[in-house]
C-alpha cells in the first residue's frame, strides 16, 4: 500500500476537513496553533502534546473552545497504553491503597511529572489527585528545549481513595528511573530510561 506524505509550511495548504491533528509544537505557541487550525479547518479529532500551555488563560480559552466545538481531544500521556501497565492494573487490589514512587536523576520533573500522575490515576481508577507536599530545589535549570526551564526536588500527593504518589527528581548524573508500585502484598519495581523499561521485578513472579 502506497502512502502519500505531504509537507506544508502553513495551515492554508491543508485539506478543508481533517480526521486528526496532532499538535506537538512548543507549549508557548500551542494554543494559537490549535485556535487557528480549528478556525480555518474542520477538525474531527485532536491530540495535544504536554505540557499543554504556559498561561492559565490559554487553559480556560481552549477549554471553552473544545466544549463549544465538541472536538474529541486527548493529551499524549502514553504510559497507560503500554502492555506492561495494562497487565499490572488487573493484578492490583483496589480494596487496599496503592503507593507509587518514582525516583531518578534529571528526568524532567517540570515537563514529565504529568506522565506519572496520569499513570497513578489510571492504576488507581481515581482522578481527583492533588499534591500535598512540595519540596523543590531553589536552583532552576535550563531545559533541553531552548527558552524553557526545568526543576528538581520532591513532590508528594494522593487522592480521595487514600492512594499516594511520591515523585523524586535528583540533580545528579543521568541514570535509570525507578518506578515502584506497592499494593499489599504485591510490589512491582521497574527500572526505566523513560521510554523503554530494561529491568522489571515483581513480588508474585509476574513476568510481562
Predicted regions and their residues:
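Short beta->alpha connector loops
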Residues: 26-29, 52-53, 79-81, 171-174
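A structural signal for short coil/turn segments at secondary-structure junctions
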Residues: 41, 69-70, 95, 124-127
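Short catalytic-loop micro-motif centered on adjacent basic/acidic residues
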Residues: 22-23, 46-48, 73-76, 166-168
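NAD(P)-dinucleotide binding in Rossmann-like oxidoreductases
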Residues: 157-208
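Short loop/edge segments at beta-strand edges and connector loops
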Residues: 7-9, 48, 75-77, 133-135
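Beta-loop-alpha module in the N-terminal Rossmann-like domain of NAD(P)-dependent dehydrogenases
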Residues: 3-47, 51-65
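A contiguous active-site-proximal alpha/beta segment in oxidoreductase catalytic domains
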Residues: 12, 20, 52-117
